[in-house]
Amino acid sequence: MDQTLTQFGSVFVFLLLGVIFVVGGYLTSRLLRPSRPNPQKNSTYECGEEAIGSAWVKFNIRFYVVALIFIIFDVEVVFLYPWATVFKPLGTFALIEVLVFAGILILGLAYAWVKGDLDWVRPTPNIPKMPPMPELPVAKGASQKD
């Protein structure tokens, strides 16, 4: 019990020092920097030229889908590295666990592929146009309204 407490204690001290370092750096920079805002400092600057249009750029949603899939498989690799270093003593059960883990991710990728989320150029649906309706003959004596 004592050894576990000292191990977690060192992790806690490390986290506490990290938080103190970040907060201390933020507060020090906040106290020491000059703060004199004016309209010219707050204006947009683009290489000496006046800004034209908005700075907001709309990205296609396909970029985000590709980025999310990359992050998912990147995290998978992060989980697989420690497993690969201790694979031999863990045995067959650990191999089955990792295969299930990878299989679930591959099923998700296959679902996204079948759904069409990985198609960069999506086909446009071919909607047939209706032929024009023929004009009906007007009965004799009936008046036509314009």
From Swiss-Prot:
Domain of life from the UniProt record: Bacteria
Molecular function (Gene Ontology), one example: NADH:ubiquinone reductase (non-electrogenic) activity
EC number of this enzyme: 7.1.1.-
Reaction it catalyzes: a quinone + NADH + 5 H(+)(in) = a quinol + NAD(+) + 4 H(+)(out)
Chief localization: membrane
TM ranges: 8-28, 63-83, 93-113
Keyword Ubl conjugation attached: no
Keywords: Cell inner membrane, Cell membrane, Membrane, NAD, Quinone, Translocase, Transmembrane, Transmembrane helix, Transport
Compartments, as annotated in UniProt: Cell inner membrane
One Gene Ontology cellular component: plasma membrane
Membrane association type: Multi-pass membrane protein
Quaternary structure and interacting proteins, as annotated: NDH-1 is composed of 14 different subunits. Subunits NuoA, H, J, K, L, M, N constitute the membrane sector of the complex.
Functional note: NDH-1 shuttles electrons from NADH, via FMN and iron-sulfur (Fe-S) centers, to quinones in the respiratory chain. The immediate electron acceptor for the enzyme in this species is believed to be a menaquinone. Couples the redox reaction to proton translocation (for every two electrons transferred, four hydrogen ions are translocated across the cytoplasmic membrane), and thus conserves the redox energy in a proton gradient.
PANTHER family named among the record's database cross-references: NADH-UBIQUINONE OXIDOREDUCTASE CHAIN 3
Protein family according to the UniProt entry: Belongs to the complex I subunit 3 family.
Protein name: NADH-quinone oxidoreductase subunit A
Organism: Chlorobium chlorochromatii (strain CaD3)
Lineage: Bacteria, Pseudomonadati, Chlorobiota, Chlorobiia, Chlorobiales
